[in-house]
């Protein structure tokens, strides 16, 4: 029992100490709760103050932004005002300078006005003197004009009489012109006949030349065929013929290439088509074109002659009209060149010289008149165009009238001199060089 009592005493002490600690803790807890409530109230108050401070800070920030924007506007306004001030100051300086310049200019204008006034007075005096001299000159020239008018009337009367005399002389000269035109027309006909005969002769010569060239080509072709066959047979008989030629003759010959070229030449060479000299389509086309060109030339020459005759009737001065044949505008007959290709063409016309009414043909060289047939080597230089002779009727009389019936008759005869009936006859004999082509392609 004593042991139990002894053991219970420390436990009661522990319990008492624990109760006392619990009581302390309770009191401490109550104090902590009270302080917690106080702190909680303070926290609420502080949070409310913090919110109010945040709102005040936002308002202050907004006010600061507004103040900054206002400050920037003020600064920009100040900068603009400074620029305006600088501009106004510069414009003020320029205006002051302009004012000074205007003052100087005004002084100069006043001086020039004074000098202009003095010049005006001087010019006025000179003008009055000029007016007086003009009146004197007008009176003098009026007198001269009256004298010239009387002389002009006398000159008109004299020229009228002279014009009548020249008209009578012109009517007598028209007969001589008609006679000369008739003689020139007859000589022109004879010249056209000579051209026709010459072209026929050339046509025959070219025909015989084409036939001879064809015969010569056929002979050459047959000879080439025989030589090709002979070389082929020799190669078949002696396969080493090329080496033997090289050893004995010291010449390297490619017989296969030679035979192939010969066969190609024989296959490409043809003499079946003949060139016609009269009935070729090129010749008929060229003849129709030449006729159309002749008709066009006749119309142009007729209109030019009508105008020239009108002008000639106004410019006759001498007693007799002179007929001059310009040698530069006459036909050009040059020498015939030797042909070198398969295409043939007509030779040029012989040179023709004329001295007033005397005409002559230059003699041909023996080489031109030769009829020996040679292979073609060069094209003939062709000049099929025959320019009509320009007959210049130099009338030296200067009258404005004349016998218009005689002028019309002379005009028709001059047209007949340039007419196309003789040109068409001669142009029909012109040979188209395209009709003389011989196909000899190698």
From Swiss-Prot:
Polar residues composition-biased segments: 280-291, 301-312, 332-343, 351-361
Example GO biological process: endoplasmic reticulum inheritance
Bilayer disposition of the protein: Peripheral membrane protein
Subcellular location(s) of the protein: Endoplasmic reticulum membrane
Pfam families in the cross-refs: SHE3
UniProt-annotated stretches for the region Disordered: 280-428
GO cellular component: a single term: endoplasmic reticulum membrane
Main location: endoplasmic reticulum
Protein keywords: Coiled coil, Endoplasmic reticulum, Membrane, mRNA transport, RNA-binding, Transport
InterPro entries noted in UniProt: She3
Biased composition, class Low complexity, residue ranges: 362-371, 394-410
Gene Ontology molecular function: any one: RNA binding
Coiled coil: 11-162
Basic residues bias locations: 313-322
Its biological purpose: RNA-binding protein that binds specific mRNAs including the ASH1 mRNA, coding for a repressor of the HO endonuclease. Part of the mRNA localization machinery that restricts accumulation of certain proteins to the bud and in the daughter cell. Required for the delivery of cortical endoplasmic reticulum into the emerging bud.
The family this protein is said to belong to: Belongs to the SHE3 family.
Annotated protein name in UniProt: SWI5-dependent HO expression protein 3
Origin species: Scheffersomyces stipitis (strain ATCC 58785 / CBS 6054 / NBRC 10063 / NRRL Y-11545)
């Amino acid at each position: 029992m004593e042991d139990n009592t002894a053991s219970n005493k420390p436990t009661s002490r522990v319990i008492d100490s624990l109760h006392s600690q619990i009581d302390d803790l309770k009191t401490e807890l109550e104090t902590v709760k009270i302080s917690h409530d106080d702190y909680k109230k303070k926290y609420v108050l502080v949070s409310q103050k913090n919110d109010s401070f945040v709102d005040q800070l936002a308002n202050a920030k907004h006010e600061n932004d507004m103040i900054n924007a206002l400050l920037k506007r003020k600064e920009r306004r100040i900068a603009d005002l400074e620029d305006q001030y600088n501009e106004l100051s510069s414009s003020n300086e320029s205006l002051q300078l302009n004012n000074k310049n205007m003052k100087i200019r005004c002084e100069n204008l006043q001086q020039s006005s004074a000098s202009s006034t003095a010049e005006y007075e001087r010019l006025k005096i000179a003008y009055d003197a000029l007016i007086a001299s003009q009146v004197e000159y007008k009176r003098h020239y009026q007198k001269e004009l009256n004298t010239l008018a009387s002389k002009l009337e006398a000159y008109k009367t004299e020229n009228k009489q002279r014009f009548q005399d020249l008209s009578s002389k012109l009517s007598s000269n028209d007969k001589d012109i008609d006679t000369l035109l008739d003689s020139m027309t007859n000589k022109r006909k004879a010249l056209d006949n000579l051209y026709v005969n010459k072209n026929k002769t050339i046509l025959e010569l070219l025909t015989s030349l084409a036939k001879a060239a064809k015969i010569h080509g056929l002979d050459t072709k047959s000879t080439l065929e025989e030589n090709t066959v002979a070389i082929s047979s020799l190669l078949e008989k002696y396969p080493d013929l090329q080496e033997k030629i090289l050893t004995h003759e010291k010449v390297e010959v490619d017989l296969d290439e030679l035979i192939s070229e010969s066969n190609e030449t024989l296959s490409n060479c043809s003499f079946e088509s003949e060139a016609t000299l009269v009935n070729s389509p090129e010749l008929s086309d060229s003849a129709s074109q030449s006729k159309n060109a002749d008709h066009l030339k006749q119309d142009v020459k007729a209109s030019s002659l009508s105008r020239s005759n009108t002008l000639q009737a106004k410019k006759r001065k001498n007693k007799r009209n002179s007929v001059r044949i310009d040698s530069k505008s006459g036909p050009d007959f040059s020498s015939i060149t030797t042909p070198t290709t398969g295409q043939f063409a007509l030779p040029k016309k012989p040179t023709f010289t004329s001295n007033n009414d005397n005409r002559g043909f230059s003699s041909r060289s023996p080489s031109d008149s030769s009829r020996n047939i040679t292979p073609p080597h060069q094209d003939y230089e062709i000049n099929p165009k025959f320019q009509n002779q320009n007959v210049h009727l130099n009338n030296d009389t200067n009258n404005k009238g004349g016998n218009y019936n005689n002028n019309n008759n002379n005009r028709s005869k001059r047209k007949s001199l340039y007419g196309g009936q003789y040109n068409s006859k001669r142009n029909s004999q012109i040979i188209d060089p395209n009709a003389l082509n011989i196909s000899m392609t190698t």
